[in-house]
Amino acid sequence: MIKIVGLVGWRGMVGSVLLKRMQEENDFSRIKPVFFSTSQFGQDGPIINNISYNILENAYNIDVLKEMDIIITCQGGSYTKEIYPTLRKNGWKGYWIDAASNLRMKNDSVIILDPVNYNVIEDSINKGIRTFVGGNCTISLMLMSLGGLFQTELVEWIAVSTYQAASGAGARHMIELLNQMGILYKSVETDLLKGSHSILSIEDKVTKISRSVNFPVKNFSVPLAASLIPWIDTEMSNGQSREEWKGQAETNKILGTKDTILIDGTCVRIGSLRCHSQSFVIKLKKDVSLEDIEEIIRNHNKWVDVIPNSIQDTLLKLTPSSVTGTLNIPIGRLRKLNMGKKYLSAFTVGDQLLWGAAEPLRRMLNILINI
């Protein structure tokens, strides 16, 4: 029987990417979609595959939401906080798929990344779990790249440095970054075109403008263009940022590990638009040849791509500009470190809006509609 699927937050950045992927994979032919809105209910809905969905339902109408077999939401944490418990208290037994982080660590939820933890997902469905939540973007991208090493239980611990895109903070942040870039360029455009000023004088002008009170920093609080921000999310009592705390907590929940795999590091915001990059130092449980490591990683899933550790391959294939908008998960800079034969270096890049956000939700929907 075709399931009725409610879609909430489909106009936003993650929701828009989700809808595009669903159209590309012809997912709408397998469901009866109902589109909801928090602010424009009653207005015309979208046109999907030449089918017009005329009326947007009220995303706060519990009675209508209760009619859904599945609800998939990219509306954000505030919506989840208000609606999810109310729905459950009103007896709704449907499946809830969520991009927001609120429910990730709840005992009655599963963090979804089926190429990595399909067995965990399948087991949870059989046990009656009905809440499925997308993971933190960097963690999902890490697991997609290193999934083979986790699957073969080779990882003792990981130290990670992230280089996270503006998209992870939201659409307004992306716009602010581009505005910052534009202001900095315009301030020295004439100097660059004429070539009459030294680069140091140009740099000095750029720096002064980025420090001025009129520079747009409403969203990031500080300049990101021509800079970086070595803190993401809130502050924890142990000195970690919450983004750094998620690394170990969410990874172990996703994998369903009995013994905790230690993961820690520093999360940094950079001027990339929508691709996160990560640098890993991995302590292996035993010495494994680099050739075998590459084979283990390569064989885990069809999206991961082992990049040869050469200058040319790295520059061409292991950058945000080469990965943005694709499902590819390149991993490179693979080499043993001077610390010993069990110490491995790796670097990976992935699209924050695809495998980092929308794609696990889409794939979870397909798992549920096939039940």
From Swiss-Prot:
NCBIfam families: asd_gamma, PRK06598.1. Belongs to the aspartate-semialdehyde dehydrogenase family. Homodimer. It comes from Buchnera aphidicola subsp. Acyrthosiphon pisum (strain APS). This is Aspartate-semialdehyde dehydrogenase. GO terms for biological process: 'de novo' L-methionine biosynthetic process; diaminopimelate biosynthetic process; isoleucine biosynthetic process; lysine biosynthetic process via diaminopimelate; threonine biosynthetic process. The keyword Cell cycle does not apply. NADP(+) binds at residues 11-14, 38-39, 75, 167-168, 352. The keyword Signal does not apply. The lineage of its organism: Bacteria, Pseudomonadati, Pseudomonadota, Gammaproteobacteria, Enterobacterales. Catalyzes the NADPH-dependent formation of L-aspartate-semialdehyde (L-ASA) by the reductive dephosphorylation of L-aspartyl-4-phosphate.
